[in-house]
């Protein structure tokens, strides 16, 4: 993904396919991963949805619940996700993965989260 940033912090993501997405802000975060059924994690999010790939836990003061996000973490693009769960404090994001092994492999990474506009 190529990123074009305006002076106000907003900008566009441009993909190899030629498609674009507009974002209102980019936030540098610490990214981690979680999965259901491990360490007491259930299958329901704070917004009442069922966890699945594309769900993220956030600090709702940083990313409002229901926000569409695009996540790029060091060494990988997680891609589109939605802020549907809580439990993080500050500029952090916890990305849902399908397995514990994926979570271990992901570890803790520095990344950028783009808050997408409608």
Please provide the spans of the model-predicted regions.
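Solvent-exposed, well-ordered loop and adjacent helix/strand elements within mature globular domains
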Residues: 1-118
């Amino acid at each position: 993904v190529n990123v074009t940033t305006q002076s106000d912090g907003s900008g566009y993501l441009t993909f190899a396919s030629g498609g674009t997405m507009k974002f209102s802000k980019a936030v540098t975060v610490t990214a981690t991963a979680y999965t259901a059924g491990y360490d007491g994690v259930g299958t329901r999010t704070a917004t009442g949805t069922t966890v699945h790939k594309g769900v993220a836990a956030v600090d709702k003061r940083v990313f409002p619940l229901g926000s569409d996000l695009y996540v790029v973490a060091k060494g990988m693009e997680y891609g589109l996700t939605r802020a549907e769960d809580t439990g993080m404090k500050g500029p952090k994001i916890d990305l849902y993965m399908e397995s514990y092994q994926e979570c271990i492999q992901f570890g803790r990474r520095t990344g950028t989260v783009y808050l997408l506009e409608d």
